[in-house]
Amino acid sequence: MMDINEIREYLPHRYPFLLVDRVVDLDVEGKCIRAYKNVSINEPFFNGHFPAHPIMPGVLIIEAMAQAAGILGFKMLDVKPADGTLYYFVGSDKLRFRQPVLPGDQLILEAKFISCKRQIWKFECQASVDGKPVCSAEIICAERKL
C-alpha cells in the first residue's frame, strides 16, 4: 500500500493533475497494481465539463490509468523521478469507455505489465466504479532518462 506522500515520490504530477490518491495493492513480482482516485465535485474540471451534468473527462480517466501504470513501472525498475527517470504517455490501443464517472465516485485503477521493448512499456489497464468497468485500454509509455 502507498499513501499520497509515497505516491508523490513516484509521480512527478502535482495538483490539479495528480490523479492517484492511494495505492491499495502493488505486486512487483506479479507486475500489477491497484489504486484509486476519489472523484470530488470540487475537481476543477467539473467547472466546465459539464456544469449542469458533471462528468469526469475521458482523457483524465486515461491519464489516471497511465499514472497508476507509471507507478508500477517505477517500482518494477526500483527508481523514482528524482533518480532521473520519467515515463511519458505516448499512446493507447484498444481504448473503450463504458459508462460515465460522476462526482462522488471512487475510480478504481488497475494496471498489469504486458511488455517492454526499447524503453517502450505497455500495460493493460482498466478503470471501474462499484465493480463496473468504465474504461479499459492498453497504455503505452516511453521511459526516458533526464
From Swiss-Prot:
It is found in: Cytoplasm. The keyword Cytoplasm applies. Keywords: Cytoplasm, Lipid A biosynthesis, Lipid biosynthesis, Lipid metabolism, Lyase. It holds the Pfam family FabA. It catalyses: a (3R)-hydroxyacyl-[ACP] = a (2E)-enoyl-[ACP] + H2O. HAMAP family: FabZ (MF_00406). It comes from the Bacteria. The gene is fabZ. It is an enzyme of class 4 (lyase). One of its GO terms (cellular component) is membrane. Its EC number is 4.2.1.59. Belongs to the thioester dehydratase family. FabZ subfamily. Disulfide bonds: none annotated. CDD domains: FabZ. Involved in unsaturated fatty acids biosynthesis. Catalyzes the dehydration of short chain beta-hydroxyacyl-ACPs and long chain saturated and unsaturated beta-hydroxyacyl-ACPs. InterPro entries: FabA_FabZ, FabZ, HotDog_dom_sf. The active site is at H49. This is 3-hydroxyacyl-[acyl-carrier-protein] dehydratase FabZ. Transmembrane segments: none annotated. GO terms for biological process: fatty acid biosynthetic process; lipid A biosynthetic process. One of its GO terms (molecular function) is (3R)-hydroxyacyl-[acyl-carrier-protein] dehydratase activity. The keyword Hydrolase does not apply.
